[in-house]
Structure formats: C-alpha cells, structure tokens
Curated annotation (Swiss-Prot):
Bias (Basic and acidic residues) ranges: 209-219
Family assignment from sequence similarity: To phage HP1 protein ORF19.
DNA-binding region, residues: 214-245
Full protein name: Terminase, endonuclease subunit
Region (Disordered): 209-247
A GO molecular-function descriptor: endonuclease activity
Family matches, as InterPro entries: Phage_P2_GpM
Keyword Zinc: no
Function field: M protein is probably an endonuclease which directs cos cleavage. The Q, P and M proteins are needed to package DNA into proheads and for the conversion of proheads to capsids.
Gene: M
Keywords: DNA-binding, Endonuclease, Hydrolase, Nuclease, Viral genome packaging, Viral release from host cell
Biased composition (Basic residues): 227-247
Length: 247
C-alpha cells in the first residue's frame, strides 16, 4: 500500500516522463523503477494457473498503478509507455471496460503499441478483449453499459483486424441491447455481426427480432349489422274471424 505522498510522486513522475514525446522512456530512472515493479507483478501472475484467480490478483494489484496512469493521461504527450498498456489489458481482464477505454482513447490517439510479445495491434487487441469482457459479464448475468461497447466500435472503426473479431463485439452489443428492450438497435448490430462473420450464430435471434419488429396488421372495424325487424304474425283464425259488434 502506497502513502498519499508516494502516490503523488508517482503521478508527477509519470506525467514528466510521458511528456517526452517520441523519446524512449527506458532512460527515465523512475520509469525503469516502475518497470522493475511491473515485472515483479507479472511474475506473480505467471505463477497463477486459474484465469479467475489471476483476474482477482490483477484486481488487487491495479490500485497501485492508478497514480501512474492518471499522471500519463493528464499530461502525457504520447511517449510509448509499457506500464500504461499493460494496465489497460489488466483492466479488461478484470471486467473494467470503462477504465480500459479511458486508456485506449489516449493510446490510439498517439499510436502506442502493445509491450513484449503481444502480436495484436492495440485496436485489434482492445476490440477483442472488450468483446470477451462483455461476453463474460453477459454469461454471468451482469449488466454492461452499451455506450462503452458502441464507443469501442467507433474508436476502432477504421482499424484493420479480423472481421470475426469485430463481429464478436457487434454480437454482444446486440445481445445487451436486446436485453435492454432496444429491438431495433439490437437487430442492426446482429445483422452487422452476421455480415462480418456468417458463423456468428445470430441468425435465429435476427429472425425473432424481425418478427417482433414487423408491423402488425391493424384490426379491421367490424361492419354494423342491423337486427331483423320482428313482424307481427297473424294466425289464420284471426284473419277470418269477424269483429264483435258492440252491444
């Protein structure tokens, strides 16, 4: 646990090093110290086999890095920062889509790259991991703000990535919109998902939503029917019987 003074110093140091636009941070002493700490955290995580336990450990470790992240996002000018990019990925692993999106806006604006052996580009990685985080939440019956999902789609709209990856995010966005009662919005995202990936597994849901949204024929007004007039029947005896004379 860091003290308020340590957190402040960490935030200021992060801001100062991140202002070295286009300059490698490996020469920044504080940055090097933080990389040593990050490497130790990563070794701790590597020793954990369970994905669930690993996510819980990341959730425990993340608060330490918050001052660094805040310092970079507030005053940074786009220098490559492996700490920031690692924290973005950890936030996604713990289901913090909003927190990861906060970093992604900065990272994509300045063209930061993923550290180490990551082969996916940041937009590709971010889109896929947001989709997976949202899918995990949906499977657990948890809610996700669909505005975070649609912003992710907009933020990465021009980036190159496998169509199947973008389809995943459209699919889960559509499912959350459906659950929220937005049938039209859900249909649009599910249709886009199947356009990108015919194996997206949403065809039946699309058919159901199309039936739901199909205009129902208005009931025709019933024609007014007149009741037949009752005629007074006259018996044959009455027709031939003479009227009584007055006495």
């Amino acid at each position: 646990m860091t003290s308020p003074a340590q957190r402040h110093m960490m935030r200021v140091s992060a801001a100062m090093t991140a202002q070295r636009e286009a300059a490698p941070l490996r020469h920044a002493t504080v940055y090097e110290q933080m990389l040593v700490k990050l490497a130790a955290d990563q070794r701790t995580l590597k020793a954990i086999y369970s994905k669930e336990l690993k996510a819980a450990k990341k959730r425990e470790l993340l608060p330490f890095w918050l001052p660094w992240v805040n310092g970079v996002l507030e005053l940074g000018k786009g220098a490559q920062d492996d700490i920031l990019m690692t924290v973005m990925l950890w936030r996604l692993d713990t289901g913090d889509i909003a927190g990861a999106l906060e970093i992604a806006r900065y990272a994509l604006k300045y063209g930061l790259t993923m550290p180490g052996k990551h082969r996916r580009t940041p937009p590709y990685m971010f889109t896929e991991e947001v989709a997976l985080a949202a899918m995990r939440a949906h499977a657990a019956g948890e809610s996700v703000d669909t505005r975070l999902l649609t912003e992710t789609l907009e933020l990465t709209a021009t980036a190159d990535m496998p169509d199947e990856v973008r389809a995943k995010l459209h699919k889960i966005t559509g499912l959350f919109l459906r659950d929220g009662g937005d049938a039209a919005g859900a249909l649009a995202h599910l249709q886009r998902a199947t356009q990108l990936d015919c194996q997206a597994g949403v065809k039946k849901e699309i058919e159901r939503l199309e039936r739901e949204l199909k205009p129902k024929p208005e009931p025709q007004p019933k024609a007014a029917t007149r009741a037949p007039r009752k005629t007074r029947s006259v018996t044959p005896a009455k027709r031939g019987r003479p009227k009584k004379k007055a006495s």
